[in-house]
């Protein structure tokens, strides 16, 4: 009794200490709107409302945790001084439930913060008293804690019953408090600055200004404590042991979650949940536009931008926009030249991880994607998808300008440049322009003579990968492409497409100069050089020039004496494939070229052309000496020999 009276007198003597008791609830700092008022707010105002309300709730939780730390310290101090101090009661009241005054938009945010705060309290509850234990030597704070001070967890209702004079005494009296000021007072005040001005106003009006000047000073000093959890690897410190454990994963590369199916390991539970869907095939997120399903919500969000056309990610260098952030990151490497993904086998680097994975299949020879129709295997999933179209005949990519259809999107994009006139890739040697960088790279090998693709069987090298693939079929004899009309087989898809035009009589390529039509683009390009006189292919031995690379290749064999084409019947060899084909008709008796006038057949196309001049009376070969004309070149040569003999006789 004497001690209580002395305490009461000492309180009365100190000015500003006799403050009224009361409680502060979330309702006191909440800004309430009716449903009608809420509907009048625009999205920006609603977002601001949620941010302010959530900040006030955080501040009250901050005060709650800090006052508990003060009470624990007061109890510890009592073990040394012997004073009996009632630190007051701190409670949460269930009367102020979220649903009483909060809209559904706020519930989710506050519940989420409540869960995070519980995690913080559970993992780091010992931390606030760490510094005080060192000063007081106390080992058991729970023995001195008041039974009524344990907070009751509720969803939202937060109240404080505090005897403020005792709190003020806690601040001003005792050596331990001074030691605490010296050890912790130098820490940053940023945490207390986060308390909103509105919350300070409410507290000041309800309890008086001394509460802010006394209690919050101690709250600041206690909460801005040292970080007791330090990493032995790098020395980085954390407030809570859970954060330290998560940080250790970056050093040890440990993974907490392992897939039971494939053994892959992950450091977060949500990642393994996503990964499991790869095995189960579960796709829970569905697009309302096209019905396509996805395993992750983020994938669905990116997919929706295909329908809306939204491309929120913009390159600062060239202004190009993208629908995905990862696509922008990969695009930026084109400007920086960065290639962070390196092959361990050959040291080649790539700008994308997917490109590295595809490249590794070259070394391993792995082809995990198999066609169910013909059993052919592929190293890339996209290649298998394109291959499937060969069986179905589907061409899903259509040009809006001319209705041309294509198997691949890249082919369509390349075709569109014909309409736009775009030709951004220019050869520095001959100024020729191309629609893609791959075409330019292939063209430049004409000037450099580079042939990087080599056959493992015979050692022959090629400037194009497609040419090497075609050459391989000569060794294997494989001809996977069959004509449905006549059953003829081909080793290349392009050859089958060209062959189909023979049945259809289609000749889509037309010369603008003479209106002559062709079934192949290469034939049209070769024909155009007749009008322009261009002969870009030059022999390095005799400097003779030719209109096509095939003509140059045939001519080169004149110098080398090479005759790679052999007849299976008589073993006769030839330096040109066309001559071999003509020779083989001698054995087979085949005469595929027929005259429409008289029905006569020939085994060579040139023989048919010469015969048709008999019906047309055309004589295109003219002698420069006497002006006489002939139907065939051989006849002209024979005639010119007569003039030569006369000149010899005159001499």
Curated annotation (Swiss-Prot):
GO CC aspect terms: nucleus
InterPro entries: KRAB, KRAB_dom_sf, Znf_C2H2_sf, Znf_C2H2_type
Compartment annotation: Nucleus
Chief location of this protein within or outside the cell: nucleus
SUPFAM superfamilies for this protein: beta-beta-alpha zinc fingers (SSF57667), KRAB domain (Kruppel-associated box) (SSF109640)
Key words of the record: DNA-binding, Metal-binding, Nucleus, Repeat, Transcription, Transcription regulation, Zinc, Zinc-finger
GO molecular function: DNA-binding transcription factor activity, RNA polymerase II-specific; RNA polymerase II cis-regulatory region sequence-specific DNA binding; zinc ion binding
Record field: transmembrane: none
Zinc finger annotations (C2H2-type) as residue ranges: 227-251, 257-279, 285-307, 313-335, 341-363, 369-391, 397-419, 425-447, 453-475, 481-503, 509-531, 537-559, 565-587, 593-615, 621-643
One biological process term in Gene Ontology: regulation of transcription by RNA polymerase II
Record carries keyword Metal-binding: yes
Domain (KRAB): residue spans on this chain: 24-98
Known function: May be involved in transcriptional regulation.
Recorded family membership: Belongs to the krueppel C2H2-type zinc-finger protein family.
UniProt name for this protein: Zinc finger protein 816
Organism: Homo sapiens
